[in-house]
Amino acid sequence: MTWRVFAQDDAPRLRVREWQHNARQFFETDLEIRDPHGAVAKIAIGPSVREIRGRLRDEDDLRDALEIENARGNGMYDLAERRCGSVWVVEREGPDDRAALVIAAVIASVCLGPILGDGALFGVRTAREKLDELVSPYR
């Protein structure tokens, strides 16, 4: 189970300082990057560690994103998906994996692309709403 985060970089690159800055500023979270090697690293948020892998966007990524967009009928991210040359794949331990969603949202906030997973395509704002639901499911 993963999140795929579209990135407007032609090739994946670890943007450690920017990710750490946005994690602190917008998510009140500290990210620790461990074992960086090329476009692969482990990211720790407290005791939770998730692997991320950057790669070039492929046709399956675009097809999956456009399929969801077409089903919703709003074309909200269509241009962003097409501008994104790379994708970050964020490891998840399950559907309620808060750490993985924070990591995906932080990457999306820097790389300016949507997040794809669980049959949905969404941006940082929706990710923040999902995070709020994970913290307090009984509102």
Model segments located where?
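Acidic (Asp/Glu-rich) sequence patches and key acidic residues
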Residues: M1-R139
